[in-house]
């Protein structure tokens, strides 16, 4: 663990699994409508199911900037551990939901907890990787998201084999257990802690306020270009991720237990290749 050349990649490996769980838990719901609507009748309406998917994205979007501010001020290891534990507990509790409203609010809490993860994780990776390994490390970490997305497609397969309640329970238990593993093995970079201490101990230097930081950001044209770059593909991207399993099942008459994996794997494979190549080229 103390080997400086190895541990930065151990961090990537540890967070890779968290990234997998992050997308797996959010994606699995999109493939489980058919199994769940037998017990929760509101899910027979496309509008209700769409609202269930949308509340997560709305809250995730609004919380992401807040999560970045929090990650700059709180121990990031514990932020990662806490967010993983909460969203995994939410996944577990979704197996006990009896109506649409319970699912709706649990999905909202998941949006808050999952939003806290990415800023903390990327900041940790950046601290442990300097120079030419940083972009590759971020790219490798991002592949965990897409593998998790692909595995989430098997939620319908597991629900068909067992039950949707058991699927949520076991997926949630895996995340809760792994949060305990992170407590033991995930570490902050000591250099980061030293840098923070120097800033705190410097009496003459005035810390920039959140408002001044946001003002600087919002007046930067590069920020708006990058924001548009990510927003433009996200609209059709999330619509596709959330509804492609249903489209395959309804329009192509493919059983949802097969439509789920097919729809998520096809998107995940291309994304996986893209982030790895992008990381290598960026370095």
Identify the function of each model-found stretch:
Residues 106-144:
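Cytoplasmic helix-loop-helix junction between adjacent transmembrane helices
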Residues 10-42, 240-245:
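Extracytoplasmic
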Residues 32-62:
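Extracellular/periplasmic helix-loop-helix junction of adjacent transmembrane segments
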Residues 29-30, 218-275:
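Extracytoplasmic gate region of multi-pass secondary transporters
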Residues 141, 145-190:
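Helix-loop-helix hairpin linking two adjacent transmembrane segments in secondary transporters
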Residues 1-4, 190-226:
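Juxtamembrane intracellular "pre-TM" segments in multi-pass secondary transporters
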Residues 27, 57-65, 149-150, 267-276:
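Residue-level signature of mid-helix packing/kink "hotspots" within the transmembrane helices
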Residues 62-98:
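Conserved MFS/SLC helix-loop-helix module at the cytosolic interface between two early adjacent transmembrane helices
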